[in-house]
UniProtKB/Swiss-Prot annotation:
Residues 201-236 have a biased composition (Basic and acidic residues). This is Uncharacterized protein YJR056C. The keyword Lipid metabolism does not apply. It comes from Saccharomyces cerevisiae (strain ATCC 204508 / S288c). GO terms for cellular component: cytoplasm; nucleus. Keywords: Phosphoprotein. The modification Phosphoserine is found at S221. The lineage of its organism: Eukaryota, Fungi, Dikarya, Ascomycota, Saccharomycotina. InterPro entries: HAPSTR1-like (IPR029196). Pfam families: TAPR1-like. Present with 1890 molecules/cell in log phase SD medium. It comes from the Eukaryota.
Amino acid sequence: MEQMHSLESSLPPEQPPTKQAIESLNLELSQEFKLAANAVTRLYRVANEKNSLTKHQGYLTCLDDILCALDSNVTADELRAWCYKRRNDILSNSQDKSLNPVKERERKLNKFSENQHRENEAHKEPFEKDSAVKYNFSFNESNGDLSNINENIAPKFRLSMPPLSVEHPPRNASRIKSWKARTINHGRGDTRNLNDITGLGHERERDRENTHYEKKPKLDSDSEVDIRSFRQDMDL
C-alpha cells in the first residue's frame, strides 16, 4: 500500500525539467483556474435565473387565477375569502412538511409506549391471579381461636406429599425404611441395638487374643545351601 501511495510522487515527469516546460505548465494552470471560475460563475447565474423564472411563473399563475375568478362574476368579499383560503392552505402544507419528521417520530414513540404498557398489563394480570390462588393462606381456619392457644404445646403440622426430588425409587425403599427404624429406635432410647454392637466388639477382641501366630523356624546355612542346589536342579 505504501508503494502504491508513493507512485504519484515517484513517477518520472512527462517533460524535461526546463524553463520553457515550467512556463508552459504555469500558463496551462492559470487557464484551467479561469475555466473553473467561469464554470462556477455560470452555475450560480443559471441557478439564479431559474429561481427568478419560477417566481415570475408563480406570480403569473396567481394573476390568471384572479382573472378567472373575476370572469365568473365573483364578488370582492368572495375573492378575498378565496385568496385567504389559498394562502392558509399553502402555509399549512409547508408547515406540515417541515414538521412532519418530528410528528412522525413522536407518534411512533407514543404508539410504542402504549403497546409496551398494554403488554405489561396483559402479563401482570394472570400472574396476580395465579399468585392470589397459590399463596392465599388462611391461618385462622386451621388454628381456630388464637387466644386459646397454649404456649407449652408444640404445634402440629399436617403431612404432605414430598416433592419429586425427595421421592425414592422402589429398590431403595427397604433400605430407607430400615434406616428410619434404627433412627427412631435410637431416638426412643432403645439400648438393644447398642448392646448388640458392644457384644460384637467384645467377641472380635477375644478372637484376636486367642489367635496364635506360628513363627517359622530359622534355617541354618546348610539347609539354605541345600535349598539353593535343589532349586538349581529344578531349573535345569
